[in-house]
């Protein structure tokens, strides 16, 4: 079976094209950003172990497990974040919230952002990646979620402060957004 046939198999199973591509790249150990490779190598033969891995991943997805949990990462606002079952899968439409928060911080010398329920840190890290001078506090009640968010901050070399708190209960200070 070649690459194109394998991806068609994913579609026949019920996977949307993008999901099939991402799962195939993951099954073959390629970067999830390497979708152009699929076009350039569509007639390449696929190793039987890669076919089996792809079909196993496809079955997980067909059981409604989020793609981000299956592959362990998600692209958000141009950042690659580690994602697992400790946090919710960040939604692409949440990037609109980041755009709004960035607009609110325009004109401020050192904007202060508070991200309540940070989960993976997606919003906090996206803000910090765009405004290095911003002060960002990411809050979550879950120590496990904060651990993953801190791992993401470390992996991206972004300095964000993290606090375990039930919403505002431990939060001190004033914030612009």
Language-model features: where?
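SAM-dependent Rossmann-like transferase core, predominantly class I methyltransferases
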Residues: 51-131, 136-151, 162-164, 169-171
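Structured loop/turn residues at beta-strand edges in well-structured enzyme cores
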Residues: 18, 108, 158, 173
């Amino acid at each position: 079976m070649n690459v194109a046939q394998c991806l068609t198999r994913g579609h026949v199973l019920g996977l949307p094209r993008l999901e099939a591509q991402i799962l195939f790249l993951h099954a073959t150990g390629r970067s999830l950003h390497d979708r152009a490779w699929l076009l350039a190598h569509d007639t390449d033969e696929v190793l039987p172990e890669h076919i089996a891995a792809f079909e196993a991943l496809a079955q997980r997805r067909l059981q409604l497990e989020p793609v981000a949990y299956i592959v362990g990462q998600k692209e958000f606002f141009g950042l690659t974040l580690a994602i697992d079952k400790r946090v919710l899968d960040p939604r692409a439409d949440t990037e609109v919230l980041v755009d709004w928060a960035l607009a609110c911080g325009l004109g401020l010398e050192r904007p202060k952002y508070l991200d309540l329920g940070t989960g993976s840190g997606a919003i906090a890290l996206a803000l910090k990646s765009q405004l290095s001078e911003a002060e960002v506090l990411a809050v979550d009640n879950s120590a496990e979620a904060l651990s993953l968010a801190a791992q993401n901050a470390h992996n991206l070399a972004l300095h964000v402060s993290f606090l375990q708190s039930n919403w505002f209960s431990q939060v001190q200070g004033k914030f612009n957004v």
